[in-house]
From Swiss-Prot:
Source domain of life: Bacteria
Functional note: Binds 16S rRNA, required for the assembly of 30S particles and may also be responsible for determining the conformation of the 16S rRNA at the A site.
Protein name according to UniProt: Small ribosomal subunit protein uS14
UniProt keyword terms in alphabetical order: Ribonucleoprotein, Ribosomal protein, RNA-binding, rRNA-binding
A single Gene Ontology CC term: small ribosomal subunit
Cross-referenced InterPro entries: Ribosomal_uS14 (IPR001209), Ribosomal_uS14_bac/plastid (IPR023036), Ribosomal_uS14_CS (IPR018271)
GO MF term (any one): structural constituent of ribosome
Endpoints of the signal sequence: none
Species per Swiss-Prot/TrEMBL record: Ectopseudomonas mendocina (strain ymp)
Coiled coil (residue ranges): none
């Protein structure tokens, strides 16, 4: 089990990313636009750098919803491999069955 502080930190990062997503996309569009002036690009880069580090989506980490485990997490279910297996064996995941051949 991950520490509660790690889970809370990740939750705070998700909220920060959501808060700055629109403004960040606008600034990145200005930077990527070949028709924008060099001054506008420079101002956009400076404004982007002044945003919090955690506003970047690349700082997010997928964690298991139950345990908070950072590795071996299936995106489709939001569970780590261990908890997904347990849930599948109990029949909690509709349509997911153990393979047999």
């Amino acid at each position: 089990m991950a520490k509660t502080s790690m889970k809370n930190r990740e939750l705070k990062r998700q909220q920060t990313v959501a808060k700055y997503a629109k403004k960040r996309a606008e600034l990145k569009a200005i930077i990527a636009n070949p028709n924008s002036t060099p001054e506008a690009r420079w101002e956009a880069q400076v404004a982007l750098q002044k945003q919090p580090r955690d506003a970047s989506a690349s700082r997010l980490r997928n964690r298991c919803r139950i345990t908070g485990r950072p590795h071996g997490v299936y995106r489709k279910f939001g569970l780590s491999r261990n908890k997904l297996r347990e849930a599948a064996m109990r029949g909690d995941v509709p349509g997911l069955v153990k393979a047999s051949w």
